[in-house]
Amino acid sequence: MATNTVGIDKEVEVNRKENLRDHRLYWIGRRTQDVILSSLALVVLSPVMLATAIAIVVDDPSAGPVFSQERIGRNGKPFKFYKFRSMCPNAEAKLDDLLDQNEMDGPVFKIKDDPRITRVGKFIRKTSLDELSQLWNILKGDMSIVGPRPALPREVEQYGDYEKQRLYVTPGLSCYWQIAPHRNDLSFEEWMDLDVKYVKERSFWVDWKIIFKTFKVCLLGRGE
């Protein structure tokens, strides 16, 4: 896998270093928190994850329960992103046929009632169970509990300097956008505004506020 960074030029990189110079204690505490929480969650939720994997394979045995995909992390560094499979195995190949139905402005593709989503996929998306495999990404250090959702390389290639600010921090399992009411009705610009807001406001208090609201979203089945 390529190790070169994507989407961060030298000028933006200098600004990033200045912006984060006073946050070393926060980063150390945040990483410690991520390791502890992800380790505990992997143990406690392992029966749920096993049941999810079995349900996916029973519903569609043509592929495995987890898929990996290259995403862009902090400082534009690519990493292998894991997610419980909620779509048919050839979902990427079918994307070109659906691009004209895209309901999201900007470089992100989203449509309601995506025909590539499987029966089990609809349930695990609504309950956010499809995200549980990313606990491994968090334990590895590719992701954090809280942070902007990791973007695809093709999306980052279209970022301007404003959108690149979301790459200053480690991508996360949940964020302001993830807990926003009717999040899929938000425009791409509104989504980026929420991510930049997090970059500027991030703190332990903000992180825990998002974590608690994420539990509420999952319990109420308000996931995608």
Describe the residue ranges of each PLM region.
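A generic structural signal for residues located within well-ordered alpha-helices
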Residues: 28, 46, 112-115, 130, ...
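A hydrophobic, helix-centered structural microdomain
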Residues: 17, 21-91, 209-224
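Active-site alpha-helix of zinc metalloproteases
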Residues: 26, 30, 117, 126
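Hydrophobic structural segments characteristic of membrane proteins
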Residues: 1-16, 64, 132-224
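Short acidic-aromatic low-complexity motifs
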Residues: 124-134
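Short, glycine-rich, amphipathic interfacial segments at transmembrane boundaries or analogous
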Residues: 2-9, 66-115, 174-193
